[in-house]
Amino acid sequence: MDALTVAPVPPGRVKLPDRRHAVVIGSGFGGLAAAIRLGARGYRVTVLERLGAPGGRAAVHRQDGFTFDAGPTIITAPYLLEELWTLCGRRMADDVELRRIDPFYRIRFDDGTVFNATADYDAMRAEVARIEPDDVPGFERFIRESKRIYEVAFHQLGDQPFHKVATLLRAAPDLLRLGGHRTVYAKVSKYFRNETLRIAFSFHPLLIGGNPFTTTAYFCLVGHLERLHGVHYAMGGTGAIVAGLVRLIEDQGGTLRLNAEVEQITVENGRATGLRLAGGERIAADIVVSNADVAWTYTKLLSEHKRRRWTDRRLARARYSMGLVVWYFGTNRRFEDVYQHTMVLGPRYEGLLQDIFHRKVLTPDFSMYLHRPSANDPSLAPPGCDAFYVLAPVPNLASGTDWSTEAEPYRQRMQQRLEETVMPGLGECIVTSRMLTPQNFRDRLLSVNGAAFSLEPQLFQSAWFRPHNISEEVEGLFLVGAGTHPGAGVPGVVSSARVLDQVVPDPAMLRATAR
């Protein structure tokens, strides 16, 4: 990705009443980043959030003295966030403290084997050698290959708009040369023979809603991204970043409206002219940016507009990411042996993922990601206590699972598994608890099929094949977030806002819809 090309707006310009109006639907990371970038370019910005607090998937839950991040817990490529502060003439470090976490995470396999992923090349090499000495040469080659993929697929193309076929054709030779037609697991298997190591180096697509056995090998870049930029935690939780971004928008002169549910994007002569809220209020806009779920945007917010490409039928047939069961809980004692980021894997890998993504059946076995933020940030729990967040990938709602009856039995199985592996005695010390299931993702976040990461990142749902950042259906409508290019994850959704710099017209060149 190239350096910044957008200059900060001089403070004297932020209150001009005749600036062109940009309305952003949704206040997830993508929407907040888009709002800041539009404000920096001279737009008057309004952000509309249907819920009572900003953040979207990055909202915050507080109960019984504990603070839980609802969604993202890992910050990689922090420079993408730092750019937003730079655009406003500020330093991110003055508002948010990022703490580097290394090792990144600890992977516990079903047989008790532990693998520590780290930025330290020699330490990582030693981890590989400890598990399978014969795979060390393959590890060294894979590290070099991961870097090459990163430099093309993320550094060069991650913030480039892919709404033109010509862009895809120019990129295709490099992407094919790097094995983009293969899957992540197939790519990793070229370098590692040991199945434990194949799992350790191929699971990353799950962090963005993908199946390692179907996700394009471009996503082998994630490992290099982590090593290059580090894995970080925001002190106070990811919600501290959300709060900082909201302050930037307000300091630019922008507005965040909560409990403002958008019912329809209004269109005249093929151009977006504003929005109609659920209560009937109409808001005029020169451009509209949707950070809502991309399928929801097209099927619900543009239901009154005839669409050529992203029709209801096409979106119904698209492949969506898996769902998640997320259990937040607090304990009245600390579990000092539990690392901040821990993967607790079950007995199956490929078979489990086939059940989740393709067969769409809920199975007795599962794998979990356990987050213990209070390991480094005791402010998130009362004294002597610990805050936890554990999630398990599950089929999305296309499975027909009734989570109103399945949620509690599933939570109990998660608790039992934690007690058997890394948290003995857990059941005796839980003092607060809450859950999210795919039904919550559907009903609260308006995510189609309750998918946790919108569209699944398969080859033919990536880059040009993904819904574009500039809408093909309506002039003046732009998309950011997990369902558009480049995809899910904090770096992906923040980069989707970066793409807008190249596709949103300069406000001075835009014919007025509203003042």
Enumerate the language-model features and the residues they cover.
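Rossmann-like flavin
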Residues: 108-214
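Helical element adjacent to the flavin cofactor pocket in flavoenzyme catalytic cores
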Residues: 221-278
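A glycine-rich dinucleotide-binding beta-alpha-beta segment and adjacent secondary-structure elements
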Residues: 194-208, 363-371, 424-486
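C-terminal segments that line or cap access tunnels to active or ligand-binding sites in enzymes
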Residues: 332-442
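Extreme N-terminal leader/targeting segments of oxidoreductases
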Residues: 1-23, 40-41, 458-465, 471, ...
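Mid-domain catalytic core of redox enzymes
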Residues: 2, 263-382
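A conserved FAD-binding loop/helix module that cradles the flavin
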Residues: 72, 482-505
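N-terminal glycine-rich phosphate/pyrophosphate-binding loop and immediately adjacent elements
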Residues: 13-151
